[in-house]
Amino acid sequence: MQGDFTNLLIEEKECVTWQSIARKVPRNVMSFAARLSTNSLASPDNLRRWGKRKMGICPLCASPNATLAHITNMCTVALNQGRFTWRHDSVLLQIASTVKSLATGETEVFSDLPSFQVNGTTIPADILVSTGEGSKPDLVILDRKRKIIALLELTCSLPGSAFKAHIMKDKKYTELALDLEAKGFQVFIVPFEVLSPGHITKQCKDSIQNTLQLFNIRVKKTLYENLGKIALLCTMSVFHAYQVKEWVSPPLLAP
């Protein structure tokens, strides 16, 4: 447990939103966040380790080792039911709506959300017709006149797997980027991570900021606070529902 606490301190130092969130959420939410980061919530695996259960089985998928990471990010049943997608899309809605509201001039903004798509996708057909894996980034920012396009892809990952997710998402859109470059566009692939405990690293924030500046879009730091807060609240909801067999995704969460 000491190692978990040390990791929490390191993450807090590197996270641009953690301390801001701490001042703006109820005490019970911050308590949940601290226990989440130190692996001291009552997951099936922890209950087994604490001697309160004989087995640490996941109530949803029957995995024999239902760790906290499994419950909040890895359970296949929870994934297929849309629990993790609800968190992802809630975070995505916040950044997409903010960026779209600030876009000016020739800048267009599309996102893989119903009210932000163009003909069911995120890249206009007159720019490029592309289907299949790696054809629909989460967020697309486009300036036709300057021939610049940014492909942003969100992951709400565990702290320890953020780098792996970043590399995987970067590779996912390589072919799409090449097709767009063949059309004369300057392409920026921007994977970014809002971690499930609500952390956003300075590196991630800087990457988003630098991308938005290409389109003369400037966001306030409250955007990152809101992204972290939404991720944390969604993770809290996912955790508290892990013993509920059925899931109907509620409306996307707002800060």
Task: List the predicted regions and their residue ranges.
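Helix/loop segments that flank and initiate small ligand/metal-binding modules
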Residues: 1-65, 90
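A short acidic/basic microdomain associated with nuclease active sites
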Residues: 37-50, 99-132
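Short, flexible/disordered secondary-structure transition segments
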Residues: 44, 68-72, 102-109, 180-188
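Amphipathic alpha-helical interaction motifs in eukaryotic regulatory proteins
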Residues: 34, 38, 76, 92, ...
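Short Cys/His-based metal-binding microdomains
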Residues: 49-99, 149
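Non-catalytic C-terminal interaction segments of nucleic acid-processing enzymes
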Residues: 1, 83, 114-140, 145-146, ...
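Glycine- and acidic
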Residues: 18, 76-80, 153-159
